[in-house]
Regions:
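Terminal, compositionally biased segments used for targeting/anchoring and flexible tails
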Residues: 1-108
Length: 108
């Protein structure tokens, strides 16, 4: 079997999985609410900035941590956001599992 054909079959299977469909639906629902989506994107940007800063060896800014915690608390109470987080988690788990399978196959 051709490796590229297998990769395309895997891609198709992922797109047909419940985890992917739920994630795509949750993402679309979140994006349909402009103000909520803007708040969500702001949270994600701040979270990424904080992680990059911490990875470069800087201590986390306490004020920024507090802002992030409050934003997360507010966002997680919204049904669209909480469903997005759940769906994203399931989808990430699927991708992580597939990555582990591929990594095991590459062990020499």
């Amino acid at each position: 079997m051709n490796v590229y054909d297998s990769a395309h079959n895997l891609s198709k299977a992922i797109k047909e999985s419940e985890a992917y469909k739920d994630y795509a639906d949750a993402k679309e629902n979140l994006e349909s609410n402009k103000s909520l989506n803007e708040s969500f994107l702001d949270f994600k940007r701040r979270e990424t900035d904080l992680r990059v800063s911490m990875l470069s060896g800087k201590e986390p800014d306490e004020n920024e941590m507090e802002i992030l915690n409050k934003l997360f608390e507010v966002l997680s109470k919204d049904p669209l956001c909480s469903e997005y987080y759940r769906a994203e988690g399931r989808y990430r788990q699927l991708l992580d599992d597939l990555s582990k399978i591929l990594a095991e196959a590459m062990q020499i």
